[in-house]
Amino acid sequence: MSPAPAATQAPVSVSLFDLSTDAPVLQGLRLVSHFPEEALAQSLQTSCPGSEEQISPERRPFQGALDISEKLFCSTCDQVFQNHQEQREHYKLDWHRFNLKQRLKDKPLLSALDFEKQSSTGDLSSISGSEDSDSDSEEDLQILDEERADLEKPTRPQGFHPHRVLFQNAQGQFLYAYRCVLGPRHASASTYCVVPLEESELLLQNLQTGGPRDCVVLMAAAGHFAGAIFQGREVLTHKTFHRYTVRAKRGTAQGLRDARGAAAHSAGASLRRYNEAALYKEVRDLLAGPAWAKALEEAGTILLRAPRSGRSLFFGGREAPLRRGDPRLWDIPLATRRPTFQELQRVVHKLTTLHIHGEDPRETSRLDLPQTHRKRVRERKVIEEESKVPSDENEALGQNKEAPTQGSESEGGDGSQVELELVEVTLGTLDLREFDVFPKQRRRKRNKRERKQDLESGAQMTLSQQPKEDEALSGSAPLRPPLDEATSPCQSELWDVLLAACRAGDVGMLKDRLTASPLHPGVLPLLSAPLGSGGFTLLHAAAAAGRGSVVRLLLEAGADPTVQDSRARPPYTVAADRSTRNEFRRFMEKNPDAYDYSKAQVPGPLTAEMEARQATRRREQKAARRHREEQQRKQQEQEKQEQEEQQRFAALSDREKRALAAERRLAAQLGALNPQTPDPAITVSNIPRCWSCGMSLQGLVPFHYLDFSFCSTRCLRDHRCQAGKPSS
């Protein structure tokens, strides 16, 4: 066995923008990533050992530049044609197909006359005959075609990357750089042919100058667009667009589905089509702008990444921003993610990175990945043996028919019976999960009415009316304040009395009880004691019931507004109305340091000046609302009066309308002589109106014919039709 190759050193990565012209790495560069014809032929010979003796002169690789022949000639059948149609018809003949097989098998070719003679005598197997012969011949042709493709295709050596260029410097180091950042492509350049001398010098010059100075990068995919203009490493400008054009759970754009003839007519499909058109317009307007158009014209390198279906964004239509065949235009030779500005920066950084190897990377790849040579040989004997398998199996099955009887006789002779028991075993794999999976439970949202009922039930909760669930949660302990002082029967009675007074708003009884607090030490602890498992205090009950005076009295007596119930709610948040909440704010203004009001969730103090301003603002709002309502009422009356006058005028005859018009003209003349304040009723009745519908013509340009005036052409046409005159 050959010893394993030594581990190669990892290549060093250097940015092209960090290299200067006099860098040691760039001294004595020469281009080594081209393939002469001799190297190509040698690679073909070494790819298949022993193939030199098998390959006929006709199948040897063509020496010279590869191009498409324009001659009307078939090299297989040695036939000359008059036109392309005759040449295409020849390729469909059995004679041409037979000669192709003969050529692939290295057998002599037949002329047209010999082929007709042998086919008429039956010496040749029919190319399109029975199914067996046809399938065999087609399989042979396919296998030989694969062998020919393996032998004749220009296999490139290991370690060669078509999008990169390999250089070697004076120190013997190998430099790998991406071709797209080393200037425009040459017209006669080819991937596997010799690089022209002019392009070789251009590549060396661009590498030594530090890569592209002006570069435009454009990416578009799935409704996303990203573009940037780079000057060296610096970003001059960039722009991104995003439109919803991809169909849900499909990953394809809407336009691609429409192009297949399955256009959807839903609202979502229409929205996606609109977004496609909007994205097309936005990108075209951006690239047609002065800054981007100038950058595309002066850039030395243009990098593009777009799917085949989305390239019309850059090449289609009139005044396309990019031109096909532009030598500066390159496809991005990297796998890219979603088009974003960060992805553009990553692509430019990746493409402008120079990889420096200590050894030839092609040799390293060849040693690391040895080539495996495969031979595809079809043997008729193997097929014949496989065809005999069914008959052999039938014979074996016939011989085995007696086996069960013999086995049963032997078992009967031995007297031993074998019992088989079928056991079903269930294997659980839930314990192998990394995380526990629980079904997601949806919380039902309660409406305002349910929340209000909860507050009322909390306010009316007493010790004797606690639900049975509270008994289960609190154990066997009675629903009493968790205080030692409240264990006596007198304390329980006092608690019930205070709670009933808070709910009913009995301020007098509370004053009598609270004024005796210095004499009765059991009253003061009950003010802030929670009520059972619900956690309601006396202050909670009074606030939920909307008793503002009771809340003020309890706060002045020493009730703590920071005590929370079982749902972590202070008394301020359960207040029934604004007036009750204002009592907490007034107490905060008088006693700012008494409690932690942030814990009590009281927003701020309420001073007398603030209340005065609020009262003034409410009065102004009320006056404005009354004035607005009065204006609306007057407007409605005017509209009603105008509608009645319009209906009355429309019901008049033409004679009466002429009389009213004469009176209106006379009144206008008298008003000009004696100007007075007009009466609103007279003004409404004497204003000019449409002769057909009676609509007021004030502020409108009327339509006239003869002595009649109309508000619209429709009324004019209706009046003419009624008068029996033509409308033209």
UniProtKB/Swiss-Prot annotation:
Active site location: 254
Modified residues (Phosphothreonine): 607
SUPFAM superfamilies named among the record's database cross-references: Ankyrin repeat
Lineage: superkingdom: Eukaryota
Comp. bias (Basic and acidic residues): 380-391, 610-656
Domain VLRF1, residue spans: 211-354
Per-repeat ranges for ANK: 493-526, 534-563
Compartment(s) of residence: Cytoplasm
PANTHER family: ANKYRIN REPEAT AND ZINC FINGER DOMAIN-CONTAINING PROTEIN 1 (PTHR16036), TRNA ENDONUCLEASE ANKZF1 (PTHR16036:SF2)
UniProt name for this protein: tRNA endonuclease ANKZF1
